[in-house]
Amino acid sequence: MKKTLAILMALVMVLGACTFASAEVKTYKVGISIYQYTDNFMTLYRNEIAAYFKTLETDEVKYELVFADAKNDMAEQTNQMNNFVTQGMDVIILNPVQTSSADVLIDIAVSNEIPLVLINREPLAYDADGNTLDEAYEGILNNPKVCYVGADARQSGTYQGELILATANQGDINGDGKISYIMIQGDPENIDAQYRTEFSVKALTDAGKTVECLDSQVGNWDQTKGQELCANALTVHGYDVEVVFCNNDGMAMGALTAIQTAGRIVGEDIYLVGVDALPEAVEAIKLGDMTGTVLNDHIGQSHAAVDVAVQLLKGEEIQNYYWVNYVKVDKAYAAAQ
């Protein structure tokens, strides 16, 4: 009897070992195209994507990430999407170069039955006459394996305006009854840039303020360009400039250099606001060198994007849109970080 039990136990152990040995590790291939690596915010975003995917790996499931820099070139990004198809990606995460042409990229994924998660730059839709509609590209809404993860840029613009309204003189530094500002915009085709430009000023007019736009220029999210545009505006308009609105913190940091070079003092004779809450911007707010910024939550957004990508890999149902809220960052908030 003891001998029989011993044989049975040995068989169980052998079978168990065979089962363990035969268990295969499933590796999913994830293609990730970022519109431009030099963008400060998207650098934080893509690094967090990589880090978060790593935390989700198990003994049975691994993720092979293939990152690609589109270099702000639509043709380059289209090639990357086609390469992802050739490489047999199981899911694609896409940060589109041109939101107005995202349908081309969406169609590549859909026609090849590859799940697609668009991030950060919301695709646009147009009517038959080419007029922009206030909704995203219908290819997202009409496909169960395509979604967008981002934040409502109208909220970020509104928060910028509210940061100005929260100052002691509500933005009217010289007391002439109007708020005179310059606007440094990101990519004019980007819906986030459009909404931040519109709603930052709308927050002021909705509060009953009279505004005057002294200058509005395109900085394409670039810090050096932001410095150049702000310097030019300060040279032309001098102390008439009371507020500098920047569509992102990269350009705001450039504007800060121009402001300091011109001998102006943020909080005394000029205000400066951005968006993203980059570490250097938050530090500038702590020091009083920036009026405020708006937290564009790269951690929340990147985690949401990865989570929905994993859901798609599992064949689970998803929503077409996932929104992550912005947060106002003033001196008190910055000091608490």
Language model region names:
Residues 105-155, 278-286, 291:
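Flexible loop/hinge segments that line or gate small-molecule binding clefts
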Residues 29-57, 66-80, 87-89, 95-100, ...:
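Extracytoplasmic "Venus flytrap"
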Residues 26-28, 37, 128, 133, ...:
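Hinge/cleft segment of the Venus flytrap/periplasmic-binding protein
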Residues 41-56, 156-163, 191-210, 225, ...:
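Short, solvent-exposed amphipathic alpha-helices that sit
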Residues 77, 136, 147-178, 226-227, ...:
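Hydrophobic alpha-helical segments within soluble ligand-binding/sensing domains
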Residues 56-70, 205-223:
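Short beta-strand elements in bilobed, periplasmic/extracellular small-molecule ligand-binding domains
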Residues 1-29, 85-86, 107-112, 332-337:
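Short, low-complexity disordered leader/linker segments with a strong preference
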